[in-house]
């Protein structure tokens, strides 16, 4: 059976929980057509998370890599178009805060996703979920992991990879107090629709 690697992150900064964990844990083991979803949670650590992703890829040998990240403050599901070869941001969970560093010293400046992001947002909107394409994944861990996934996809013909930012869950929004949120079941359903569109694009 063909495999999908679906990743999320542990809590970070002032977010006491991370709904990507709940989404990944809920969808882990699900089957969509001839694809099997395998979920993994990554550390919020610039060094460790990239190595973890590489180990998971080596173990699973996925044809599709979809990574999820929390975008606290956004109200829409936002598939990302591009990852850039820069890491620069607030401290990770081990206190490391890179400034103007390359993800890969000899790497390309940027990679465009090869996920069907236009089909994703069209499907989400048809189903009543707010969605739009994002043209920046930032320079924090989300961009870092998207870039690493796309490096693998570039090196392995037929592999598709990309990143989807999600809003907060209601639970997190209530805890935080200043960001919008969705019901966790809607976040799970929306991500599943994105996976379905990716599978459909690969089968046609």
UniProtKB/Swiss-Prot annotation:
Domain of life: Bacteria
Keyword field contains Protease: yes
InterPro entries: Peptidase_C15, Peptidase_C15-like, Peptidase_C15-like_sf, PGP-I_bact-type, PGPEP1_Glu_AS
Subcellular location: Cytoplasm
Name listed for the protein in its UniProt record: Pyrrolidone-carboxylate peptidase
Pfam family, one: Peptidase_C15
GO cellular component, one term: cytosol
PROSITE patterns xrefs: PYRASE_GLU
């Amino acid at each position: 059976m063909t495999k999908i690697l679906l990743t999320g992150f542990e809590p970070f900064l002032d977010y006491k929980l991370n709904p990507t964990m709940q989404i990944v844990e809920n969808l882990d083991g699900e089957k969509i057509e001839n694809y099997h979803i395998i979920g993994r949670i990554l550390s919020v650590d610039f060094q460790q998370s990239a190595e973890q992703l590489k180990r998971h890829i080596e173990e699973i040998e996925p044809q599709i890599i979809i990574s999820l990240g929390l975008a606290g403050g956004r109200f829409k599901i936002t598939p990302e178009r591009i990852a850039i070869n820069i890491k620069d941001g607030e401290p990770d969970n081990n206190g490391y805060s890179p400034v103007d560093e390359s993800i890969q010293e000899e790497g390309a400046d940027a990679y465009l996703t090869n996920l069907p992001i236009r089909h994703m947002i069209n499907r989400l909107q048809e189903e009543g979920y707010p969605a739009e394409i994002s043209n920046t994944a930032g320079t924090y861990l989300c961009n870092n992991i998207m870039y690493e996934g796309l490096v693998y996809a570039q090196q392995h013909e037929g592999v598709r990879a990309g990143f989807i930012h999600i809003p907060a869950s209601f639970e997190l929004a209530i805890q935080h107090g200043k960001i919008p949120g969705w019901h966790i079941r809607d976040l799970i359903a929306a991500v599943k629709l994105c996976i379905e569109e990716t599978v459909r694009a690969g089968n046609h």
